[in-house]
């Protein structure tokens, strides 16, 4: 039975609470055969005061409406009129009224009768008030009053339509909750874990790495005074050893720095007492600022290592390109102590370099950034052991100021094929010493008279040109000391 095709449905309102389906059928059955009597009940199965009666013949329904409208039934005046569908509904399926969006009238009808008939969705044809006190035949009002307590469960079981707006509202609430929680969860994911503070140790490890250039691409300006000073002066009795490439001043090879301060690139301060600094290999300490492009750096910016103390040897086993830093510096207005890489060593301070020691090799090998540790050691010692062009059986002896040291004997040992002990003075009258050897054992006593192994007899009578002279060194003095006599020779001062 299609509801749209069944116009014989009457709405009976204002019923007594005690009136039941049998009474209604007995009263209205006088006008014609009745196919369905539907008494609307609440949750407690009590009558809500209105019902729907469907006649088999629509003409009988019209006659019953005329006869029974306004009559009294069980002590109450009833209203009988043609039930019709709400104006907002269309088609065969009934939509729930707006006021009862969470409940289905069909479910309520089924709860009243136990079966759904053709009376679903029918509304009275006109509005009016009856004697039940506040009841209106407008089914928008009646449904809103009568169906709100009804559960949603019977609606879904009775085959009625699902709730129209309850689920979307729940979804909207869940979505709003998710929306409110989502950004919070995202904020928790993004900002929940505090960023780990870059500690000094981890920063130093990054700076010490040979594969990473540290802060090579950092364009920060105005760093602090001791920005790149990774290691403080070592404590007494502590020997620091480094297995890197030791390109100490390579940080300013592409620095493009202007107006540098007084002690900017002084990597090694005057050594402190009782320590030995050792560098084994290929560590590029200051390559971190190789592409820094930093201006106006502070006074002790790139002073990384406080050198060893008085009376102890500084040793470098590697490819130490000490002065590669000023190859591509493009620096303007350096201050008074800018290019002073090494402070004047104290007396009895022996600087030793067991390696390639190409001090001014910056013009030829300025771009060799990724030489491995094994490569540096293997290449350096292989070149010296095979008699390369840098130092061929070269042995020079000298002191810091042309005089033997006054303190106790300082024995220094090393092993290589060539020896060079030189005294270099910068333009400020300060000196630094380098002792480079490659192959066989030697030892130096307090007067710096060194004895070599007999595998490579020293040639004391001549002084071979040093690679620093070929590239331009900083006015060094190479002295050969035999007993107390010395002979000096000056190179050009084209470097500074």
Swiss-Prot record:
Region (Disordered): 81-345, 452-496
Keyword RNA-binding among UniProt keywords: yes
Cross-referenced Gene3D superfamilies: 3.30.70.330
Domain of life where this protein originates: Eukaryota
Listed Basic and acidic residues bias regions: 204-214, 242-253, 276-289, 313-326, 335-345, 484-496
Gene Ontology biological process terms from the UniProt entry: mRNA processing; positive regulation of mRNA splicing, via spliceosome; RNA splicing
CDD domains per UniProt: RRM_RBMX_like
Domain named RRM: residues: 8-85
Positions with biased composition (Low complexity): 97-114, 149-159
GO CC, any one term: nucleoplasm
Keywords associated with the record: mRNA processing, mRNA splicing, Nucleus, RNA-binding
Record has Nucleotide-binding as a keyword: no
Any one Gene Ontology molecular-function term assigned to this protein's record: RNA binding
Location within or outside the cell: Nucleus
Main location class: nucleus
Polar residues: compositionally biased ranges: 175-184
Tissue: Testis-specific.
Note in the entry: The RBMY1 proteins are encoded by repeated regions of the Y chromosome, mostly within the AZFb region. The exact number of functional copies is unclear and may vary between individuals, and some of them may represent pseudogenes. The proteins are very similar, which makes the characterization of each protein difficult. Thus, most experiments do not discriminate between the different members. One can therefore suppose that reported interactions with a RBMY1 protein involve all the proteins.
Assembly mode: Interacts with splicing factor proteins SFRS3/SRP20, TRA2B/SFRS10, KHDRBS1/SAM68 and KHDRBS3.
Role: RNA-binding protein which may be involved in spermatogenesis. Required for sperm development, possibly by participating in pre-mRNA splicing in the testis.
Protein name in UniProt: RNA-binding motif protein, Y chromosome, family 1 member F/J
Organism: Homo sapiens
Species classification: Eukaryota, Metazoa, Chordata, Craniata, Vertebrata
Gene of this entry: RBMY1F
């Amino acid at each position: 039975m299609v509801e749209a095709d069944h116009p014989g449905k009457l709405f009976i309102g204002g019923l007594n609470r005690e009136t039941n389906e049998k009474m209604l059928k007995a009263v209205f059955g006088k006008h014609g055969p009745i196919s369905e009597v539907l008494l609307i009940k609440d949750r407690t199965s009590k009558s809500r005061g209105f019902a729907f009666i469907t006649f088999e013949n629509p003409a009988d329904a019209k006659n019953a409406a005329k006869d029974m409208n306004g009559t009294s039934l069980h002590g109450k005046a009833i209203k009988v009129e043609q039930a019709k569908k709400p104006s907002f509904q269309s088609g065969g399926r009934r939509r729930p009224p707006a006021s009862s969006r969470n409940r289905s009238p069909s479910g309520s009808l089924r709860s009243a009768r136990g079966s759904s008939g053709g009376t679903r969705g029918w509304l009275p044809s006109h509005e009016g008030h009856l004697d039940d006190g506040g009841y209106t035949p407008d089914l928008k009002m009646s449904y809103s009053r009568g169906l709100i307590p009804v559960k949603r469960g019977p609606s879904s079981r009775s085959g009625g339509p699902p709730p129209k707006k309850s689920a979307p509202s729940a979804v909207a609430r869940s979505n709003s909750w998710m929306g409110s929680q989502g950004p919070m969860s995202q904020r928790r994911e993004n900002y929940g874990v505090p960023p780990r503070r870059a500690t000094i140790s981890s920063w130093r490890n990054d700076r010490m790495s040979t594969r990473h250039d540290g802060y090579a691409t950092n364009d920060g300006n105005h760093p602090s005074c001791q920005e790149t000073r990774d290691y403080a002066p070592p404590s007494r009795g502590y020997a620091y050893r480094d297995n890197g490439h030791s390109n100490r001043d390579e940080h300013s090879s592409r620095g493009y720095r202007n107006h540098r301060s007084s002690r900017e690139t002084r990597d090694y301060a005057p050594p402190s007492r009782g320590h030995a600094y050792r560098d084994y290999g290929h560590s590029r300490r200051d390559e971190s600022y190789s592409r820094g492009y930093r201006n106006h750096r502070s006074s002790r910016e790139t002073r990384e290592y406080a050198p060893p103390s008085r009376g102890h040897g500084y040793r470098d086993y590697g490819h130490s390109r000490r002065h590669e830093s000023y190859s591509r510096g493009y620096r303007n207005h350096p201050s008074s102590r800018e290019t002073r890489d090494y402070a004047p060593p104290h007396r009895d301070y022996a600087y030793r370099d067991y390696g390639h020691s190409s001090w001014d090799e910056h013009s030829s090998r300025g771009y060799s950034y990724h030489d491995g540790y094994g490569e540096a050691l293997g290449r350096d010692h292989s070149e010296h052991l095979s008699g390369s062009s840098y130092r061929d059986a070269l042995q020079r002896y000298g002191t810091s100021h042309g005089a033997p040291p006054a303190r106790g004997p300082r024995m220094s040992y090393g092993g290589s094929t060539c020896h060079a002990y030189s005294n270099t003075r910068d333009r400020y009258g300060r000196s630094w010493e380098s002792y480079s050897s490659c192959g066989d054992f030697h030892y130096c006593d307090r007067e710096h008279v060194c004895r070599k192994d007999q595998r490579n007899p020293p040639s004391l009578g001549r002084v071979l040109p040093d690679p620093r002279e070929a590239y331009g060194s900083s006015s060094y003095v190479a002295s050969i000391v035999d007993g107390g006599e010395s002979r000096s020779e000056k190179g050009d001062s084209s470097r500074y």
